[in-house]
């Protein structure tokens, strides 16, 4: 029987709630009035993630007592209709229904356009009314822009004009990716935002930075002396950062075709993880010290060249047992027949500094692959002066599995049990659901929302981080488009194009295929 996995909808234990509240007291005044405004309240992100996350935090008493949630969108909605749209995703238990009703009482809705002032003025009136209800205490404001990039500029401009605090409270703006389409558009967006808000008011959210195992990267690196001496080019052969999905584009093909997997996943999620793997130890756990070190990594990274990239596009595989497998990417009616948008990409990043020179970083991501997982795989070099028969020793690997089944394990060689002296691969395994059975790991959005409330920007993307990340990938994106590079076809449910494996082999990655980690059973 597999060990029980705690759902993100499970309540956090009372002891942990008290501990969290105590640690938050320094940065969060629980009695002060707050408004959390969701722009794009009728959209999928709001229904599937934002409202459910706010409910879980509210249920667990981790939000300020005096808070109001305001949805804003163009749709003609009531609070009742809004509730219907997200309630099933909140997974409310029978004994939580009264608390959920209290949560809904704190929700309201403002209908308005994004490109005119009238709706924003109504929003400000709603905030003013809330302030009057709160004995005229100044209201802290959090604005979540769960919107397409096409309206970022106009919405942020109207916000600045109509809905800012008056200096006796604070305003924070949360921006959802994509943060631009390339280096130029990203810089234009950043320049626009800089005219309206200070850097400490802007929270560019990359939910991968809130995941438990991504958070664990810094602790693993800088909290364990045993790893520090080997974390460099003398001992590490390569680093592979993977993001694999076992489903296709589904209903997102129209949007996805304008972006592609490099913009959708590699430029943000994978590049952020790369910086955490490669950065030097920061001077402190202060947000700016950490982000300074991440920027140094991005500055040292070379621009990715076309010869170091493989792009692919999935095709139908009717024989594969999956409801989407009978349809390839271009079989979707919303995708142009001549689309060259990649659904798979592998890029090799080279970091030109003393620690990492000569160590390839493989960024690999794709849809419709053979499994769903995200992981960081550190492959170490061979043992010097090998005394065992040729080929018996395999490279050791440290693997941090981000999702699913969060785990850290070290693949290494041990003696085969018995009378002989043969060796075999095994692992030292820390599977979170096995080791921490009673702990419910927080959802990434829960963690990040709390950090915005507390004013912590450790896990949010700074302007210069964004610029240097785009600098690395924009030239190859432009070259792929200019040369109309045809993606390599791969079957739905496969490992992806074999050309990707060949490119990794070219740079020294060794895939033996003799060992596979299996999530432990109880």
Swiss-Prot record:
PROSITE patterns: G6P_DEHYDROGENASE. Keywords: Carbohydrate metabolism, Cytoplasm, Glucose metabolism, NADP, Oxidoreductase. Its main location: cytoplasm. GO terms for biological process: glucose 6-phosphate metabolic process; glucose metabolic process; NADP metabolic process; pentose-phosphate shunt, oxidative branch. NADP(+) 1 binds at residues 40-47, 74, 177. Disulfide bonds: none annotated. SUPFAM superfamilies: Glyceraldehyde-3-phosphate dehydrogenase-like, C-terminal domain, NAD(P)-binding Rossmann-fold domains. GO terms for molecular function: glucose-6-phosphate dehydrogenase activity; NADP binding. GO terms for cellular component: cytosol. NADP(+) 2 binds at residues 364, 373, 377, 401, 409-411, 429-431, 495, 517. It catalyses: D-glucose 6-phosphate + NADP(+) = 6-phospho-D-glucono-1,5-lactone + NADPH + H(+). It is found in: Cytoplasm, Cytosol. The active site is at 269 (proton acceptor). Pathway: Carbohydrate degradation; pentose phosphate pathway; D-ribulose 5-phosphate from D-glucose 6-phosphate (oxidative stage): step 1/3. It holds the Pfam family G6PD_C. It comes from the Eukaryota. It is an enzyme of class 1 (oxidoreductase). Its EC number is 1.1.1.49. D-glucose 6-phosphate binds at residues 177, 207-211, 245, 264, 367, 372, 403. NCBIfam families: zwf (TIGR00871). Belongs to the glucose-6-phosphate dehydrogenase family. Cytosolic glucose-6-phosphate dehydrogenase that catalyzes the first and rate-limiting step of the oxidative branch within the pentose phosphate pathway/shunt, an alternative route to glycolysis for the dissimilation of carbohydrates and a major source of reducing power and metabolic intermediates for fatty acid and nucleic acid biosynthetic processes. This is Glucose-6-phosphate 1-dehydrogenase. The gene is gspd-1.
């Amino acid at each position: 029987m597999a060990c029980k996995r705690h759902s993100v909808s499970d309540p956090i234990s009372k002891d942990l709630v008290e501990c969290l509240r105590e640690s938050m007291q320094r940065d969060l005044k629980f009695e002060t009035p707050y408004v959390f405004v969701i722009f794009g309240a009728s959209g999928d992100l709001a229904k599937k993630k934002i409202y459910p996350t706010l409910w879980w935090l509210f249920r667990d008493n981790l939000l300020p007592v005096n808070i109001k949630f305001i949805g804003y969108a163009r749709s003609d909605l009531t609070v009742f209709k809004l509730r219907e749209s997200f309630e099933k995703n909140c997974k409310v238990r029978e004994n939580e229904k009264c608390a959920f009703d209290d949560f809904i009482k704190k929700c309201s809705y403002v209908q308005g356009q994004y490109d005119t002032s009238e709706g924003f003025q109504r929003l400000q009136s709603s905030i003013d009314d809330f302030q009057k209800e709160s004995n005229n205490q100044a209201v802290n404001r959090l604005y979540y822009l769960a919107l397409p990039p096409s309206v970022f500029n106009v919405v942020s401009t109207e916000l600045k004009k109509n809905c800012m605090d008056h200096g006796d409270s604070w305003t924070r703006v949360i921006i959802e990716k994509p943060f631009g389409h390339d280096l130029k558009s990203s810089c234009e967006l950043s320049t626009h935002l800089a005219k309206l808000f200070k850097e400490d008011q802007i929270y560019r959210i990359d939910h991968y930075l809130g995941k438990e195992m991504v958070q664990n990267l810094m602790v693993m690196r800088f909290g364990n002396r045993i790893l520090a001496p080997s974390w460099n080019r003398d001992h590490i052969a390569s680093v592979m950062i993977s993001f694999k999905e076992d489903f296709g584009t589904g209903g997102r093909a129209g949007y996805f075709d304008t972006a592609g997997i490099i913009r959708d996943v590699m430029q943000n999620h994978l590049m952020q993880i790369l910086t955490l793997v490669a950065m030097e130890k920061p001077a402190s756990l202060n947000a700016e010290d950490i982000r300074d070190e991440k920027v140094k990594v991005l500055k040292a990274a070379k621009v990715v060249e076309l010869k170091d990239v493989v792009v692919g596009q999935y095709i139908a595989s009717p024989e594969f047992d999956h409801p989407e497998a009978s349809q390839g990417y271009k079989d979707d009616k919303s995708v142009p027949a001549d689309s060259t948008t990649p659904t798979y990409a592998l890029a090799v990043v080279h970091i030109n500094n003393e620690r990492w020179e000569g160590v390839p970083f493989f960024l690999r991501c794709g849809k419709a692959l053979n499994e769903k997982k995200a992981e960081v795989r550190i492959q170490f070099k061979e043992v010097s002066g090998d005394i065992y028969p040729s080929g018996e020793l395999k490279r050791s690997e440290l693997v941090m599995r981000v999702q699913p089944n969060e785990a850290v394990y070290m693949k290494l060689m041990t003696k085969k049990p018995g009378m002989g002296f043969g060796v075999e691969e095994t692992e030292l395994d820390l599977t979170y659901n096995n080791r921490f059975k009673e702990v419910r790991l927080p959802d990434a959005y829960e963690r990040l929302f709390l950090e915005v409330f507390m004013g912590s920007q450790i896990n949010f993307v700074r302007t210069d981080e964004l610029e240097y990340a785009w600098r690395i990938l924009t030239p190859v994106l432009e070259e792929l488009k200019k040369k109309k590079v045809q993606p390599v076809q791969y079957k739905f449910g496969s490992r992806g194009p074999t050309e990707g494996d060949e490119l990794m082999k070219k740079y020294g990655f060794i895939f033996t295929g003799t060992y596979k980690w299996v999530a432990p059973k109880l």
